[in-house]
């Protein structure tokens, strides 16, 4: 009876696999048609690859079931013959083209490592924590990187009270037939400098991103530097992983992607060595990870891991050479001109235009006899024209202008005398108003900063007193600057008003 039930179960599993295989092939046909219309769609390409992998897995499982059924039938027909004689008859495909047979359920024991495919379509490394009947196994993530991937220790002790609402993982039930053999990573010197995953005990068993700084082949121990906090640790090989995901290939460990990565790393190291020959690094190979000594062309090169030095070396630069096609260095220095404070760039442009107009070989004209004669002649012609056009209105205008000029000169002399008495003999105009405005703004911002500084350092008595004293001085300077700005504003307004009256 038990044998018949086992046969019925195997037949039902075989039918389910065939049904899934047909559905996946139909989906693959639909995806192929969509790709024919849009061959550059990245999502469709990814789905196409996942469907191919799923079809391959289903075909392998179906092949294994059919092979097992045929072997049982042959054993029933020929019970007296040894199974080795029928082995060549059962083999369907050449051994080179067939994946190693999936392990029998009894070969996956509790605690053994394996590879399994998650519901997100990716392959992960896992560990068998329990068997669910004869066909399923409960798997935990071997390299958990998040809390929902970490195994719940209370569930392992059968004491978890949250059930399906637990924020930790209770394992994943996977059919044993879909499990694959675990492929360990071959750690070697060529992987130094690569980004890996490392386990740390003080982070709830989670694996963190790190960089392999060095590797000891004798002790099988690696020095890693964690990327999140910069801490370093010396960990064995079983606490290191080259990636969060497992290798999808069906080859042995010697031909896995770790070897491909090592070959790539070796090529990269050879290229780096050829580059480092012109840089003079002390340890070109051992320092390919977290570098502490580089060919320092500048002080910032220590913090950039020598990236700029490598780029310059690839372009043919050698230490001590000058830049340029023939290494001549900089020929024409960049002109530097210090501008006066609190003036716009228009001042610099005007000054440069004046210098260009004068020319390098000419002297600036300071006037002369001919210019003075020309100026006097123009004034004489203007006076003569006014006398010829003399009328009642011109007489009234001349009288008004004369009175206003006299009053303006009197006011100006009075203001100059009062300004000299107050120490403000400076001419007030719109430009001086801008200077006063900038000074007031600067003092106000300084007062705000000092007030914030005093609020932050109330507990520090010495610092608080010094800041308070500085704040009083700054406020006094601000009050003086505001008063000066107000007086200058009034003076400019009065001057503009006088100009309007003079024009009238």
Swiss-Prot record:
Residues 361-374 have a biased composition (Basic residues). Residues 375-390, 413-432, 493-504 have a biased composition (Basic and acidic residues). A zinc finger (C3H1-type) spans 146-173. Pfam families: G-patch, zf-CCCH_4. It comes from the Eukaryota. Residues 40-69, 430-500 form a coiled coil. InterPro entries: G_patch_dom, Znf-CCCH_4, Znf_CCCH, Znf_CCCH_sf. One of its GO terms (molecular function) is zinc ion binding. The keyword Zinc-finger applies. Residues 94-104, 245-254, 260-272 have a biased composition (Acidic residues). Disulfide bonds: none annotated. Keywords: Coiled coil, DNA-binding, Metal-binding, Zinc, Zinc-finger. Residues 77-105, 230-276, 351-390, 406-432, 482-504 are annotated as: Disordered. Residues 304-350 form the G-patch domain. This is Zinc finger CCCH domain-containing protein 18. It comes from Oryza sativa subsp. japonica (Rice).
